[in-house]
Amino acid sequence: MLFINITFACILAIRFYSLSISIRHEKALIAKGAIQYGKRNSTLLSIAHVAFYFAAIIEANKQNLSFNSTSQIGLAILIFAIAMLFYVIYELKEIWTVKIYILPEHQINRSFLFKYVRHPNYFLNIIPELIGLSLFCQAKYTALVGLPIYLLILAVRIKQEESAMSHLFPKS
């Protein structure tokens, strides 16, 4: 259980580091005149994300888990998700935040990843992260209850993001 708790703390520290990047980018975007969209949804996503993390580790500690093959698969998925998070941050540079901000002269990223994967931050980072965390902590109840709730909030987020950016895409 000690390994799971220490690894969880490390993953949490990485997420806090990514949040600090987001806050720094957000301040710069606001200074450049960016407008935030979906503020209430961003708050709900943040609450759901934090709740998911804590529910998973509480569930793990109640079970007094050992690091087994399920946890190993979960950790591998988490490592993939974290790698994707930082790749997305690298690709989006200063426009990456955990919120939706659109600049007056917003440019669409057309790199390889964004060309072939729609919403890579959600589908290659967030969803795998939550699945990986559930497996790592063997938190089946957190997954069964938390994932559907999170996915509903995320679906709204994707629609809001697409709506906010619709003027940036040519009409066909």
From Swiss-Prot:
Could you state one GO cellular component term attached to this entry?
plasma membrane
GO MF, any single term: protein C-terminal S-isoprenylcysteine carboxyl O-methyltransferase activity
The alphabetized UniProt keywords are: Cell membrane, Membrane, Transmembrane, Transmembrane helix
Residues spanning the membrane? 1-21, 41-61, 72-92, 136-156
Mind telling me which InterPro entries this protein's record contains?
ICMT_MeTrfase (IPR007269), Metal_cation-efflux_comp (IPR052527)
Q: How does it sit in the membrane?
A: Multi-pass membrane protein
Q: Where in the cell is it found?
A: Cell membrane
Query: What is the name of the protein in this document?
Result: Uncharacterized protein HI_0318
What does the organism's lineage look like at the top?
Bacteria, Pseudomonadati, Pseudomonadota, Gammaproteobacteria, Pasteurellales
